[in-house]
């Protein structure tokens, strides 16, 4: 069998601990060839829209993502070709003109709330994970992130959670759990599940003639 990268999809609600799980797996393979690809960098470019209209963007809906662009980049990485990863500007609510050069690696971790929603993405994955965390923990984590990293107010985060995030989670994110090979409760705190994942990834790497 020829050399082929391993693609791991990590999904779950906003604030579920996906990033913690991703980093835990990444740390286990730090000495190897591994990269992280975040779905939320692939929100659609909205530079053609007035700023006031961009403010109404529903970032928790599947249509907010440019999955065609993400799939194009994944296929490039799977062919061991480099990509120019986009950067999303949450203050301007559109894609930045800047990009990041990313070289291909043997392990690709694709992380995002809806990475399991699109069948085309699922078909590119070797392992599909869903991080399952209680709603109260998810809202607290989302509040802290949006206030610290995205310049949001507490009131705006709470209002958005009630009117958008929660209904979108119930309608689109939670149902993707059924596509997961493994469901990880307690996010990054679940060391047993993460250790099992690391072992499984090592097995696939060996089968793909990488390790």
Swiss-Prot record:
Q: Which InterPro entries match?
A: P-loop_NTPase, PRK/URK, Uridine_kinase, Uridine_kinase-like
Where, by residue number, does ATP bind? 12-19
From the UniProt record, list the reaction(s) this protein catalyses: uridine + ATP = UMP + ADP + H(+); cytidine + ATP = CMP + ADP + H(+)
**Superkingdom, according to UniProt?**
Bacteria
What CDD domains does UniProt report for this protein, alphabetically?
UMPK
Q: Does the keyword Secreted apply?
A: no
Q: Does the keyword Kinase apply?
A: yes
Per the UniProt entry, the Enzyme Commission number(s) are: 2.7.1.48
Q: What Pfam families does the entry give? A: PRK
| Protein name as catalogued | Uridine kinase
